[in-house]
């Protein structure tokens, strides 16, 4: 192959990616974080509380949906997708997660809000369509919230689980990588597990722009900046930390083929098919690094849709009970 052919191939691939993104991302970002499932709220009568938890780092109170697992219980933190709303957490809107954990002995913690945040501490103010706010979600989830819950709801401040889908899949792994005392368990469903690689920053930036008007550079800095936080927040890069911590991890991703659960629309199938590659590579690299405390579930079906994530969470409950105690 000549040098010119290589260049042509390189630019052809880049143009293909750009064209696909331009055509599909308006639909994709509507499903990043999942297609909604109408009427999936947990049934009335569950002991769910709506808390307002102070966040000094973000300068405001953060709404948290909470269900106690009993005095001194450990907690499962369920993190939302890219289009996280300010009224309810997507896990409650689209699944019966609270009911799954009723009488399990585990508390459920659902932070509300954080659209396009990747649950990260941003480099700069998060400026979007509705103005600017401070995003210090990592600080909130690993310091302010667990300490508040320990003091006010008798929830264990350490030894908990972080589980997320889509943007929050990578976030859950990063929280556990850097805060192994807080999170001994990390679950990722259809997560973007190599966000600093190739054209992922480009796609993430476009998605964040559509989901609230945010900019990826405000979050982690320019990718070309050696001091940017892209690699710091890349689960693939942080595999050695997860292995050294002996974090229990559960990684799920479909292949873009729908089954009886549905989710056969083009955005849901395309995005899951796009995501599976980094998930498989993450598994291979994790095992090669000596990791031996993980579950990897890559079925021959599944799309970027809440129906699949709800089913996977249900499958995780016994493992969460065993590990968290």
From Swiss-Prot:
Main location: secreted
Region of interest (Fibronectin-binding), residue spans: 98-108
Catalytic activity: 2 alpha,alpha'-trehalose 6-mycolate = alpha,alpha'-trehalose 6,6'-bismycolate + alpha,alpha-trehalose; an acyl-CoA + a 1,2-diacyl-sn-glycerol = a triacyl-sn-glycerol + CoA
Up-regulation conditions: Expression depends on the two-component regulatory system MtrA/MtrB.
Highest rank taxon of the organism: Bacteria
Signal peptide location: 1-38
Binding site for substrate: 82-83, 166, 274-277, 304-306
UniProt-recorded Gene Ontology molecular function terms: diacylglycerol O-acyltransferase activity; trehalose O-mycolyltransferase activity
EC number: 2.3.1.122, 2.3.1.20
Cellular compartments annotated: Secreted
Enzymatic class: transferase
Cysteines joined through disulfide linkages: 127-132
UniProt keywords, alphabetically: Acyltransferase, Disulfide bond, Secreted, Signal, Transferase
Residues at the active site: 166, 272, 304
UniProt xrefs under Pfam families: Esterase
GO cellular component: extracellular region
Function comment: The antigen 85 proteins (FbpA, FbpB, FbpC) are responsible for the high affinity of mycobacteria for fibronectin, a large adhesive glycoprotein. They also help to maintain the integrity of the cell wall by catalyzing the transfer of mycolic acids to cell wall arabinogalactan and through the synthesis of alpha,alpha-trehalose dimycolate (TDM, cord factor). They catalyze the transfer of a mycoloyl residue from one molecule of alpha,alpha-trehalose monomycolate (TMM) to another TMM, leading to the formation of TDM.
Family: Belongs to the mycobacterial A85 antigen family.
PANTHER family membership: DIACYLGLYCEROL ACYLTRANSFERASE_MYCOLYLTRANSFERASE AG85A, ENTEROCHELIN ESTERASE-RELATED
Name of the molecule in the record: Diacylglycerol acyltransferase/mycolyltransferase Ag85B
Gene: fbpB
């Amino acid at each position: 192959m000549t040098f010119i052919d290589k260049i042509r191939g390189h630019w052809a691939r880049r143009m293909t990616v750009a064209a696909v993104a331009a055509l599909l991302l308006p639909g994709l970002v509507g499903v990043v974080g999942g297609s909604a499932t109408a009427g999936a709220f947990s049934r009335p009568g569950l002991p769910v509380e709506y808390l307002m938890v102070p966040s000094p780092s973000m300068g405001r109170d953060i709404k948290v949906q909470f269900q106690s697992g009993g005095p001194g219980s450990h907690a499962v933190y369920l993190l939302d997708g890219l289009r996280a709303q300010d009224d309810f957490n997507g896990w409650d809107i689209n699944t019966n997660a609270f009911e799954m954990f009723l009488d399990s002995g585990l508390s459920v913690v659902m932070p509300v809000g954080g659209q396009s945040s990747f649950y990260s501490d941003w480099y700069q103010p998060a400026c979007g369509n509705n103005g600017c706010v401070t995003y210090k979600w990592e600080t909130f989830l690993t310091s302010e919230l667990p300490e508040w819950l320990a003091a006010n709801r008798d929830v264990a401040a350490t030894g908990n689980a972080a589980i997320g889908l889509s943007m929050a899949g990578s976030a859950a792994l990063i929280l556990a990588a850097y805060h192994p005392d807080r999170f001994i368990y990390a679950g990722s469903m259809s997560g973007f597990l190599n966000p600093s690689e190739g054209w992922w920053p480009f796609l993430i930036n476009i998605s964040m722009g559509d989901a609230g008007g945010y900019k990826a550079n405000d979050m982690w800095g320019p990718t070309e900046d050696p001091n940017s936080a892209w690699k710091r927040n890349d689960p693939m890069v942080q595999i050695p930390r997860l292995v050294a911590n002996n974090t229990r991890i559960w990684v799920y991703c479909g292949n873009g083929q729908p089954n009886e659960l549905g989710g056969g629309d083009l955005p849901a199938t395309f995005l899951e098919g796009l995501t599976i590659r980094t998930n498989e590579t993450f598994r291979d690299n994790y095992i090669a690094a000596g990791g031996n405390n993980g579950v990897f579930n890559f079925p021959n079906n599944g799309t970027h849709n809440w129906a699949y994530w709800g089913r996977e969470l249900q499958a995780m409950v016994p493992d969460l009970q065993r590990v968290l105690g």
